[in-house]
A protein has these predicted regions:
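Signature of N-terminal electron-transfer/Fe-S-associated modules in redox systems
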Residues: 1-132
């Protein structure tokens, strides 16, 4: 529905089984694999896709950090990584590497860019919440 009816193509379609995280969206602030959610289950809920991250033409600080540290390789996993990363930052304002690893384990990067993704999350945390 997101891609075909609303033309929100940032949410990627990949495994269709909730295994890869490429289709991650935030539902009421919580990451969910959109491939596993029925539209009827979302009635009255706030759904955020990667298209909704930028505000007034400015990228979200996590998007900026991804670009700055080179956390984007092929880019296919990036929308899901960003949304899961934002949920993580809402949960842990100053996440440790272990917290990042645990919270991001539902998102797969086939290019193995995990270290830079974690770097970007920690950089964004510093910019959003100040240094710990």
């Amino acid at each position: 529905v997101l891609r075909e009816d609303f033309l929100l193509t940032g949410t990627k379609e990949s495994c269709g089984e909730g295994e890869c995280g490429a289709c991650t969206v935030l539902v009421d602030g919580h990451p969910m694999n959109s491939c596993l959610v029925l539209v009827a289950e979302l009635d009255g809920k706030h759904v955020l896709t990667v298209e909704g991250l930028a505000r007034d033409g400015r990228l979200h600080p996590l998007q900026e950090a991804f670009l700055e540290v080179g956390a984007v390789q092929c880019g296919y996993c990036t929308p899901g990584m960003l949304l899961s990363g934002i949920a993580l930052l809402n949960l842990y304002p100053h996440p440790t590497r272990e917290q990042i690893r645990k919270e991001m384990e539902g998102n797969i990067c086939r290019c193995t860019g995990y270290a830079r993704i974690a770097d970007a999350i920690q950089l964004a945390a510093e910019r959003i919440n100040g240094k710990d």
